[in-house]
């Protein structure tokens, strides 16, 4: 009986510690997403940071990127690996240093991973598209062709 009482007491203590660990859940609804322009991206693209601080090393970052219709994102690389998911619309993506609209437009729910330093580009069809990107900061973008970098214009 003492063993049962001790086991039950320990379970309650451990359970209470896990349940009250100070963490909470942040829920972000679509209407709460705050879109902004980013000088590192071409005009027409909007970005929303949902989780994390892209300037901090080691921080998990989740961002959404909204692309206008009939748009091509120039070839670029990042200093991180990225996990990308199509949230809405249709978008094509490919690897390489020259943008060619070859391949299918991917539908919502499609996802892919680009490794750190991997040159890639994207394009949209007739409609707007939204991607969700997850990476470990710090963020950054380097254009394959420096003339494509809007920060230098």
Tell what function each PLM region has.
Residues 24-27, 101, 121-153:
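Double-stranded beta-helix
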Residues 91-108, 112:
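Mid-chain, well-packed structural core segment of small domains
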Residues 105-127:
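Conserved metal-binding segment of the jelly-roll/cupin
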Residues 1-4:
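Positively charged n-region of N-terminal signal peptides that target proteins for export
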């Amino acid at each position: 009986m003492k063993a049962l009482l001790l086991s039950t007491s320990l379970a309650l203590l451990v359970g209470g510690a896990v349940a009250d660990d100070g963490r909470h859940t942040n829920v972000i609804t679509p209407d709460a997403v705050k879109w902004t322009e980013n000088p590192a991206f071409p005009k027409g693209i909007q970005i929303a940071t949902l989780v994390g601080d892209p300037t901090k090393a080691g921080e998990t970052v989740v961002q959404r990127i909204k692309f206008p219709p009939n748009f091509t994102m120039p070839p670029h690389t990042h200093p991180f690996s990225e996990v990308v998911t199509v949230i809405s619309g249709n978008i094509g993506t490919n690897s390489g240093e020259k943008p060619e609209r070859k391949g299918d437009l991917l539908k919502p729910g499609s996802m892919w991973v680009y490794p750190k330093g991997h040159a890639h580009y994207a394009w949209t069809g007739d409609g707007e598209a939204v991607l969700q990107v997850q990476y470990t900061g710090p963020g950054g973008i380097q254009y394959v062709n420096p003339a494509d970098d809007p920060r230098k214009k």
